[in-house]
Amino acid sequence: MLKPLGDRVVLKIEEKEQTVGGFVLAGSAQEKTKTAQVVATGQGVRTLNGDLVAPSVKTGDRVLVEAHAGLDVKDGDEKYIIVGEANILAIIEE
């Protein structure tokens, strides 16, 4: 299993028509974004005074992420992307 560092997040992209709260996203929005599930998160980032700021997302969250963000990686037969937390646009609440 992949364990990201810092503010990075491992995502599994959902390969289906994107919906947010039951609404199907318009074609142009689907081209600019992807829906994904958070598989793992890094520990967060340190502030200048050394405090640790934890990630805003947690394992299991469904998120909307920029379509071209991140690095494609493979772990066994599974495909994932690793993104910085700043590339996650929203948490999808069901």
Curated annotation (Swiss-Prot):
Molecular function per GO: ATP binding; identical protein binding; metal ion binding; protein folding chaperone; protein-folding chaperone binding; unfolded protein binding
Provide one Gene Ontology cellular component.
cytoplasm
For biological process, the GO terms are: chaperone cofactor-dependent protein refolding
| Keyword Cytoplasm in annotation | yes
What InterPro entries is this protein classified in? Chaperonin_GroES (IPR020818), Chaperonin_GroES_sf (IPR037124), Chaprnonin_Cpn10_CS (IPR018369), GroES-like_sf (IPR011032)
Query: Which CDD domains does the entry mention?
Result: cpn10 (cd00320)
Domain of life according to the entry:
Bacteria
Q: Does the keyword Cytoplasm apply?
A: yes
Keywords from the UniProt entry:
Chaperone, Cytoplasm
Q: According to its UniProt record, where is this protein located?
A: Cytoplasm
Q: Assign the protein's first listed, main location to one coarse class.
A: cytoplasm
The record's similarity note reads:
Belongs to the GroES chaperonin family.
Q: Tell me, what does this protein do in biology?
A: Together with the chaperonin GroEL, plays an essential role in assisting protein folding. The GroEL-GroES system forms a nano-cage that allows encapsulation of the non-native substrate proteins and provides a physical environment optimized to promote and accelerate protein folding. GroES binds to the apical surface of the GroEL ring, thereby capping the opening of the GroEL channel.
Q: Quaternary arrangement and interactors, per the entry?
A: Heptamer of 7 subunits arranged in a ring. Interacts with the chaperonin GroEL.
Q: Tell me what this protein is called.
A: Co-chaperonin GroES
Q: Tell me which species this is from.
A: Streptococcus pneumoniae serotype 4 (strain ATCC BAA-334 / TIGR4)
